[in-house]
Amino acid sequence: MAGVLCIGIVTAQPRLRQPEFYLGVHGGATAGTVLFMPSESGMSPITKACVLGGNGGFVFRYAGHKYCHFQMELTYEHRGWRQDGVAHNLHYIELPILMHLNFGGEVCRWFFNLGPQIGYCVKDESSTITHPFDWGLTAGTGLLFKTRKAGVYHIEIRYDFSLGGVFGTTVTDKHSMANPMDLSVNLGWVMPVPQKRKLKVESL
């Protein structure tokens, strides 16, 4: 259903005379936790206290349509949870692959990002997790601001929910669910990549 919706949105957009490419960076502050579901029947989900951290990385954006773009990121993200006063800090390298929709005027636009992501825990400070590979969904919304010569700036609120788990979740394990999730506030900047055939930037 989601795939059909995405195809419908893209095909309904006016195409650009020449595809546009953007490169940039982004980063911000995160608040991460883990949603645990005990394996015992009748037990309620347990959300641990948050760990505060940060994220940062690179942004690549392809614009073939005026308001609907394809965006890929390579990001470092600090995740984890706090339990009994002890912080369990996890450091991930993540690859979100997003549909980027934006609406509005020539200078300021509202945007929405949605798509899957995969990641890998490159450092576990507590040496507690058993499943370093991660995958899940990412959704974010915010405002972007276009300048004449200094690129495009944006501010975004983003939510990430892991569909994998940091621990085993089989019937013999302690938890039936151990899913990381985090909320972040990010600032970013992208610049159009120069092309041989110079046309007016139409996507922003």
Where are these regions (language model features)?
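Transmembrane beta-barrel strands of outer-membrane/channel proteins
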Residues: 25-31, 72-76, 112-120, 143, ...
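Outer-membrane beta-barrel proteins
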Residues: 13-15, 44-48, 60, 85-87, ...
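Gram-negative (and chloroplast) outer-membrane scaffold detector with strong preference
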Residues: 19-21, 58-125, 149, 191
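Residues that define the transmembrane beta-barrel architecture of outer-membrane proteins
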Residues: 19-21, 48-54, 89-95, 131-137, ...
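Bacterial N-terminal signal peptides
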Residues: 1-8
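Outer-membrane beta-barrel translocator domains and adjoining extracellular loop/strand segments
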Residues: 35-42, 82-88, 124-129, 166-172, ...
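Outer-membrane beta-barrel "beta-signal"
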Residues: 179-204
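Short glycine/proline- and aromatic-enriched beta-strand/turn motifs that initiate or cap beta-hairpins
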Residues: 12-57, 188-190, 204
